[in-house]
Design a protein with these regions (language model features):
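A short beta-loop-alpha structural element at the N-terminal edge
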Residues: 1-10, 21, 133
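C-terminal "cap" of GNAT-fold acetyltransferases
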Residues: 11, 107-121, 125-147
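Conserved GNAT-fold acetyl-CoA-binding loop/helix
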Residues: 13-37
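Conserved acetyl-CoA binding element of GNAT-fold acetyltransferases
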Residues: 71-82, 112, 141
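Active-site acidic-Proline motif in GNAT/NAT acetyltransferases
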Residues: 81-83, 87, 115-116
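Conserved acetyl-CoA pyrophosphate-binding loop and the N-cap/start of the following alpha-helix
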Residues: 84, 88-96
């Protein structure tokens, strides 16, 4: 991860800018990097940097966690650089996530999205996800999908 430290920071900050209009909600960068390192140790194949023609264009963060007494897949981050959105790369990320969740024997997956990120919500609905409801005082919407 050290090799791509600046890239993962840039991608994560941009995801916050898109979702919330600023990146202050990300918190301390070192805390994020420590959290990411811990997740990679448990689910190494759940952290993916996406490459296209030799350039890093996206990031995917996946894990398995408990929700309401059952194990579910969780998408912490679907990210593509702006110029690569809307041309099939999102579906490729989704296909990878589905494979990861099947490998871990979960049939349901969740994510949370800012209600202002209408492009992301539209994509999530397109791939069959549905809204569960608002969380964190309405700052995010939990969505779920099934394999």
């Amino acid at each position: 991860m050290e090799k791509h430290r600046e890239v993962v920071i840039k991608f994560r900050k941009d995801s916050f800018m898109i979702s919330f209009g600023d990146s202050s909600g990300l918190g301390e960068i070192e805390d994020y990097l420590s959290w990411l390192k811990d997740k990679i140790a448990v689910f190494p194949e759940g952290f993916v940097l996406v490459e296209d023609d030799g350039a890093l264009i996206g990031q995917l963060e996946l894990s398995i966690r408990e929700y309401e007494g059952k194990d579910i897949g969780y998408i912490n981050l679907y990210y593509l650089v702006p110029e690569k959105r809307g041309n099939g790369h999102g579906q490729e990320l989704h296909n990878y996530a589905n494979h990861f969740f099947k490998k871990h024997h979960v049939h349901e997956f969740h994510l949370r999205v800012s209600p202002t990120n209408t492009s992301a919500i539209r994509f999530y609905r397109k791939i069959g996800m549905e809204e569960v409801g608002p969380e964190v005082d309405g700052k995010v919407i939990r969505m779920k999908g099934y394999l």
